[in-house]
Structure formats: structure tokens, C-alpha cells
Amino acid sequence: MKNFKFYLMAALVAATTCTGFTSCSDDDDAESTVNPATRVVAETKKYDTAILLCTFGSTYNESLDVYNEIIADFRKQFPQTDIYMSFTSRTCIGRAEASTGEARYKLDQWLKAIGDAGYTRVAVQSLHVIPGEEYLSLMNTDIKKNFMIDWYPHIDVLKGANLLSTDDDTDEVAQVLYNHYKDKLAEKKNIVLLMGHGNPDVNYNANTKYSEVQ
């Protein structure tokens, strides 16, 4: 788990160097009876363990490049493991496909393809920063209820928490961000502005994680 946390922190620093931000909302696309992720997983599978990285997603190419770097880092650190990534926003999936020409699949398609591929152990690592409603829906509904209970109860599953899940995590991330930007902040004319997606309810307790980092 500490390895996961370390690479989440590294990913956060990489992501903050990207200049683009986007707001994606879910839509109700027509579902196909054929799961296109099945073929991808079947062709990729080399080991008995898989890691599925889950992120809300983005429509900016700079951010998509960062995701590719995150995947490469995980493959380097977990060489005996197959690594996959899924966006949880369907709108981000569609827009990323349109801008890059690269096929991307919905979360349930990845989960079913991985579950049917014969893996004995699956780790689902959230790349969400705060434990907001998107993260809770992922872990409580998509992973726990659907994947672990209803679909594949025989698979050993590890759920990796979001980046700012504990007070210690918050302190470490704040220190990483400070160290990354301190040289630029030495000049009084410079400021650093970090933006997060947040939650629609301003009273949602996960939103306080941002002020805690500050």
C-alpha cells in the first residue's frame, strides 16, 4: 500500500504541471452486447495479478500524457503484474477517444473483462485526490457490491485508497508540493494555484481535504 501511495504522490506532482483542466459529466451512451475490453485484456494478460488504476479522467492531451507516465511507473514498480487504467467519467472517455483516436472503455467493461480473464488477485487503485462522491461510488458500488460480491466473489481483491485518505497522507502531500514549488515561490511575484474537481455539495466533508493541504 505504501508503494501505491508513493506513486500517487508522484502522479499528483506530475499532474500539477499540466495547464489544462476540464469538467466532465456522465451521459447515457447506448450499451453494446459485446465487451471490447475483453479482447484487450486477453491479449495483455501475462500474470495472475492485475492492477486497475481508476481516475475520473480528462479531455486534455497534457493530462492524458501524464496518465501514460503513471501507467509506465506502475509497470516498472510491479513487473509481475498486468496494469490497466479506466476513466470513471463516460464523457471524458468519449472526448479522449475523439481527440486521440485511442479506444477507451467504461469501468464496468474493464471490470468484467478483468474478472473473466482468470486473474486470481486484482488490486483496484484509485487515483482520486479526495474521498469524494466519485471515489465512494467507485469503491462501494462498482468494486465492493458489483465486482467483489455480485460478479466475482472468488477473486482476491485489494482496494487502494485515494491520495488524501489520512492526516499523514495530507501532511506528506503538502510537503511534496512545497518542495516541488519552493524555488519558484522564493520570488515574491510568483504564486501557485492548485485546482481540484471538488464535490457539488459545498458542505461535503471531503472538500475539507483541500483546505487541510493548504
Annotate each language-model stretch with its function.
Residues 1-9:
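Bacterial N-terminal signal peptides that target proteins for export
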Residues 9-17:
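Hydrophobic helical h-region of N-terminal Sec-dependent signal peptides
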Residues 25-214:
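Extended amphipathic ligand-handling, pore-lining, and cofactor/metal-binding catalytic surfaces
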Residues 18-23:
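C-terminal motif of bacterial Sec signal peptides marking the signal peptidase cleavage site
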